[in-house]
Amino acid sequence: MHDVPMETVLAVNPATMIVKECINLCSAMNKQSRDKSQTSVAALLGGGSDIFLSQSDSFVDSFHNLPTSSYHDPLISGLVQLRLKINDLKGLDSLNALELLKPFLEIVSASSVSGYTTSLALDSLQKVFTLKIINKTFNDIQIAVRETVVALTHCRFEASKQISDDSVLLKVVTLLRDIITSSFGDYLSDTIIYDVLQTTLSLACNTQRSEVLRKTAEVTIAGITVKLFTKLKLLDPPTKTEKYINDESYTDNNLKDDIIGTTTSDNDLSSTDDDSAVADDNKNEKPVQQVIREQENDEETAEKAENVEPNYGITVIKDYLGLLLSLVMPENRMKHTTSAMKLSLQLINAAIEISGDKFPLYPRLFSLISDPIFKSVLFIIQSSTQYSLLQATLQLFTSLVVILGDYLPMQIELTLRRIFEILEDTTISGDVSKQKPPAIRELIIEQLSILWIHSPAFFLQLFVNFDCNLDRSDLSIDFIKELTKFSLPAAAVNTSNNIPPICLEGVLSLIENIYNDLQRFDRAEFVKNQKEIDILKQRDRKTEFILCVETFNEKAKKGIQMLIEKGFIDSDSNRDIASFLFLNNGRLNKKTIGLLLCDPKKTSLLKEFIDLFDFKGLRVDEAIRILLTKFRLPGESQQIERIVEAFSSKYSADQSNDKVELEDKKAGKNGSESMTEDDIIHVQPDADSVFVLSYSIIMLNTDSHNPQVKDHMTFDDYSNNLRGCYNGKDFPRWYLHKIYTSIKVKEIVMPEEHHGNERWFEDAWNNLISSTSVMTEMQRDFTNPISKLAQIDILQYEKAIFSNVRDIILKTLFKIFTVASSDQISLRILDAISKCTFINYYFSFDQSYNDTVLHLGEMTTLAQSSAKAVELDVDSIPLVEIFVEDTGSKISVSNQSIRLGQNFKAQLCTVLYFQIIKEISDPSIVSTRLWNQIVQLILKLFENLLMEPNLPFFTNFHSLLKLPELPLPDPDISIRKAKMSRSLLSTFASYLKGDEEPSEEDIDFSIKAFECVKASHPLSSVFENNQLVSPKMIETLLSSLVIEKTSENSPYFEQELLFLLEISIILISEASYGQEFGALIADHMINISNLDGLSKEAIARLASYKMFLVSRFDNPRDILSDLIEHDFLVKNEIFNTKYYESEWGKQVINDLFTHLNDVKYNERALKNVKFWNFLRILISAKDRQFAVYTFLEKYIQNGDIFVDDGNFMNILSLLDEMSCAGAVGTKWEQNYENSVEDGCEAPESNPYRSIIDLSSRSINITADLLSTVGRSNSALNKNEIIAAIQGLAHQCLNPCDELGMQALQALENILLSRASQLRTEKVAVDNLLETGLLPIFELDEIQDVKMKRITSILSVLSKIFLGQLVEGVTSNETFLRVLNVFNKYVDDPTVERQLQELIISKREIEKE
């Protein structure tokens, strides 16, 4: 409730309302009175009416019906007095709040009043507080509110029916809740609040009360709990570091019996009656005396206000926790009902949820949580089978883990370990509890799920705090393994159906969290910047550390040496050893430590060890409690003496400058009597005093808690034993009483204590937990270690986690995926597998990555061997291809397509498989085995016509080489159909035979399979991922080439070879390391091209591949020679004119000459005569002539040529054929001449110009062969020179006049030039005439040559002969041969004249 202005709440004067309430109450009380008139008059008299008070007693006695003072009712009187006072004052402004409330409070607390009247009074009080009739403006508001709450907690009335009584108490509880949860509640003190808590909680826990009342009490106590612990968040924590020694009893705050409401005894009634009589007597006092009494009361009230108890705070919060603890403590489990325990747990949980983060600032509060409350939680978890109780307990446990987990590591570890044992159905030795039923285990898992739902980094936090701690177990890893184990559907057999999905959610949350973290950090940056983390290095050595510890526990000396050797102890110095024993003793046997320290030879080690403690500000017993958390005190007196002596010295030194400060000294708390100022002194015992006192404490602890001791030591006995032991005097009595009480209340628990199976739980708790909760310090600035980690450090921790659980997680996921019946679950699991694969890839867990992808591949059904696949196929059908004409689509039906199409999980795996492959950016992670599977899957799809290979990956290559699309495997049966319909299959019978006919269902499955493969993008995912291409991939592709044709692979043998070769060629052509594989793939290609039975198209395609290798990889393995010798020159039925004129044939030749233009002539192919033979064949294709000429021109005219005899003759033949090709030009020449003769317009251009020009250039090259002789590194021999002359001479007969005359002119220039190098000793000039020029006149072609050309030839012949004659290098035989030539044509006048000129010139030359 919130305070608001009065006028906004009430429409009537508050005084009027109070008067009405007084009248109503009086009326009700009068009706219930035996004599209404007496009661009324008594009320009037008791009310102090001026009519009666001003008269004498005789006047009053005249009223025969008025009772004596002994029958006056003070309750009614109080109401009447309040009404009259309000009337006199004309309002409430001059009244105190307590005056206003007092009459109502008296009725509430009066046991003689009926429940009905009490209910009316409660209604009035409810209105007063709800309608803000009293508020903070009243001076005595604090006292009024406190008195009200006190009256409510002590409410009494006459008993009646149970339901009626509970209805009254219901109003009490409701009003208490309204007051305390409003701002009025801030005025209450610790004592009052605690009283309210006791009252309300006792009502809530009393099963004899009605359900409504108990539930209302529960709501009230919950509201008060919220109020209290909300205030805890607002309190200022202690300003100095506070140490709290846990030596108090937790059983002081017990829940009291429910006594509110009805009267419990007749004595109370009589007491109440006596009080009423006295009250009535007082009310008959004179007015003056009444005024004096009121003044005295006011003075007392004022004095009380000055010494009033402060408003509630931390004290009642601590006491309240203790009260709640008393309901759930193991030793009280038989005293309280399950519902009471459940309520207590829920309230503690609410307290933790509200202000649990503030508990570490208050050591006393935190100590309650860390020890007794957590102990009770663990006990209930391990022993209870009550569902509701266990549910509340687990809710509290999860709240403690979430909010205070960083402060309670060992408590959490012990509890989770016990929970694991419960889930595993294992029992602890001595545990008499039965195995938990499935519903309980399900509840445990449900509640635990809050941990990972609350914090995605829960497992990471566990890993850092536990798994990386040498003294703690691998809690995170074991937790995850437990979840994976119970995620399997099989776990539901022994548990419940809900446990597997809950546990699976936990596993998936871990995967999701790691995956999300990885998405925020680049992998390359992680690999580059990851560093060694000391904690992770420590984690890696944990197994080694445990081995050392086990050795230590067996034999300390050997263990110490081993710890030093392994680097866990820095050196063999006593300081380093002591420091290790002090800081890292979680796994060390405390008894072994104690025996080591008390060794007479280890005195210095003992001193170093004791010096590590800080005993400042502690009593001796408190210091001993702390001391004995680190080791177990030995049993022999001499050993104890050494340790106590060292302790005494250290303790005395620590106290030399500090006094022992105890919070409750002055208050005398826990003392037998209140202390005076003289008792408050500084207690500073010397070493000897501490030695004696320490021994006495150890003996007292044994005496008080040893069950075999029957007569326990009293305080007097104890104090008498220590007389004169405090620096020669007696210890202060209060000091010894503190020690005595502390030991009596709280045993000093010795580590490694064992009391047998009956007390195994106590031993387990004390040995693992109590040692850390003996002293609690305020922890103000503690921060979660995870919050301090950089992102890359978090990833390294997650890497360590996943490395330990990846295999079991993936194994579990695959098992669940295999048996999952829901598509939704399958998708969820597959998504998790995908993320696990990415995590493996990110962290470079190569083996796990490959195993996962391989497993996925196996689940696609595509990686199954043929034999296994056949086993799975019930009815084997051939590969059927259905072509639907109206859509142009094809449907392939096969065993493989049906298997894939009918298995939805296999389809999912197929899509995911290629998606994972597509995302690989580091091919080094892919193993050879995985590469083999990838290729196997792709080939399986190719063989079954389930994918289209003509993607951009291939089409670009095809465009470059002008190749047609890759051929696909031939189906066993092909069907064409005008359109696809459901009745399609009814027409198959005419095409198919018997059992080979696919069913309608098979076609549907095949369509699904095709769509799945289409969505997977297998080819682009693998081969268009440039980052994925690697030498290992190429090797796998090439090793997959099968060059042996069998009955099994015959349908796709050739197509698959081409498919793999083409992929390999494309990949190596784009890779930087392609040269490494050029020779290898060339070898494969040569072997394949030599196979028998290849189709013409395949051989032609292989030729393009070979030529591509020649041009791209510099002719590896001289594959060009193989192409020419074994393909172009041999397989003429394939490589013919039609081929060379085709697009891909043209491209091959272009690539060939492009390659030859870029290499030196000494390449092997150019020295091969078969190459030149190939060129001769090539020029038969007109489109290729220019390419051949260009090649020849470059390598002949540029010089530096090496040609052998065979090559030279082939060159001449090529040139001669190319020169002859220009003969077609004679057609145009004849047409031109005829047009001129006829007077017609001559043709504008020669359509054969390009051919004529090419032939003309060939003639020039032939001439150049002779003109360059001597300028090259190699000279022509006689035969080569003669052959060249013959070639030119042959072109003199070319039907094309232009070419014939060009050849004749070239021949003349060569033979007549003085600079001609043909004049050598190797070749006689007359031989050139006889063997080179003259033979052309014997050719048949001469018959078709025009006489004009013949006369030109004869003119040149004449010049050559005369020139030789002048030089004297000719003979008569030559002349006679020349003369015979002229005589053939002497009938022509021109020839006759030429002959006469020749003879005349010859004679003149001879004369000279």
From Swiss-Prot:
Residue ranges, annotated region (Disordered): 262-287
Listed PROSITE patterns: SEC7 (PS50190)
Protein topology in the membrane: Peripheral membrane protein
Effect of mutating L862S: Abolishes interaction with GMH1
Positions where Phosphoserine occurs in the chain: S49
TM regions (residue ranges): none
Gene3D superfamilies hit by this protein: 1.10.220.20, Arf Nucleotide-binding Site Opener,domain 2
Cell compartments where the protein resides: Cytoplasm, Cytosol; Membrane; Endoplasmic reticulum; Mitochondrion
One GO location term (cellular component): cellular bud
GO molecular function terms attached to this record: guanyl-nucleotide exchange factor activity
Record's keyword terms, sorted: Cytoplasm, Endoplasmic reticulum, Guanine-nucleotide releasing factor, Membrane, Mitochondrion, Phosphoprotein
GO BP terms, alphabetized: actin cytoskeleton organization; endoplasmic reticulum to Golgi vesicle-mediated transport; intra-Golgi vesicle-mediated transport; macroautophagy; regulation of ARF protein signal transduction; retrograde vesicle-mediated transport, Golgi to endoplasmic reticulum
Cross-referenced InterPro entries: Mon2/Sec7/BIG1-like_HUS (IPR032691), Sec7_C_sf (IPR023394), Sec7_dom (IPR000904), Sec7_dom_sf (IPR035999)
Sequence ranges assigned to domain SEC7 in this UniProt record: 552-706
PANTHER family: GOLGI-SPECIFIC BREFELDIN A-RESISTANCE GUANINE NUCLEOTIDE EXCHANGE FACTOR 1, GUANYL-NUCLEOTIDE EXCHANGE FACTOR
Function as written in the Swiss-Prot or TrEMBL entry: Activates the ARF proteins by exchanging bound GDP for free GTP. Plays a role in maintaining mitochondrial morphology, and in the turnover of mitochondria through mitophagy.
Subunit structure: Interacts (via N-terminal region) with SEC21 (via C-terminus). Interacts with GMH1. Interacts with DRS2.
Additional free-text comment from the UniProt record: Present with 2940 molecules/cell in log phase SD medium.
Domain free text: The SEC7 domain is sufficient for stimulation of nucleotide exchange on myristoylated yeast ARF2.
Protein name: ARF guanine-nucleotide exchange factor 1
